Amino acid sequence: MTTLSPDHLKTLEQSRQRLIQLTHSLGSLITSLNQSDPLPTWSSLQTQASIISNNLQSISTHLSENHELLRSISALPAPEFPTKTHANTLEQLLRTKLDPRVEDWVSRGRKADNSAIQGSSGSTGMFSTLPSASAAGMNAGVVGAGAGGRLSEDDLAALWEWAPVEANSEARRRNWGGNFTLEEKERGIQQVVAELGLKRVLEDDDESEEEDEEMDVGFGGRIDGAPDNAGAAAGEHALPLVPINEILRYMTTGVMPAVR
């Protein structure tokens, strides 16, 4: 291809604009996470994630529609291009191979796409993406989604049989309400903080749990740090216990228990 038509130039300009929008959305999310104290609200993060998802979907659709054109175009610098001052930009434009990290992302994306295509074809049933142990047992007796993508009664029954067990198993592997997941704790809190670039020091969940245990007061227990004679003083003024049968009689008849 020697010259580009106005339509081709328009396609390239649309690609550039969509990539700029995605870059700005990602930059906005990173900035809000790094600079906000406390962290942004869940609704704010969800809104930003939706914007990024829409940008990715727009880019994916645009690249798919113009796949042939974009593959046939080669980037070559014009004689007037400032190669000395924009050497890094020129190097990126003339790359023939993807960056190793990008190549890994593309490879994982293609594998996920192939798995989704195989699952939708009905060759392995609707539960082909479930864990191997559960999927093997379910696919043996499940035919898959019927025409129009609607689940049959057998599919629904198998889904309801699998979902509670799997959800419970996943919940047990999480640390709900903590600052760090169990996986992050196993890897090391300091390593996770360094990877995420956290600037605020978050309390370790174990320390907060120990503090809660020290403050728990059970039947006959005391708050940690309370004087030893507190229990004896309370015992002197404690009223006598009421038998359970008199408590039940009061609940059913309204007759006050006998004074002892």
From Swiss-Prot:
UniProt-listed GO biological process terms: regulation of transcription by RNA polymerase II
An MF annotation (GO) of this entry: transcription coregulator activity
KW Transcription (keyword) present: yes
Keyword Transcription regulation (UniProt): yes
Annotated signal sequence range: none
Protein family according to the UniProt entry: Belongs to the Mediator complex subunit 8 family.
The protein's name: Mediator of RNA polymerase II transcription subunit 8
Main location (coarse class): nucleus
Self-association state and partner proteins as the record states: Component of the Mediator complex.
InterPro entries on file: Mediatior_Med8_fun/met
GO cellular component, one term: mediator complex
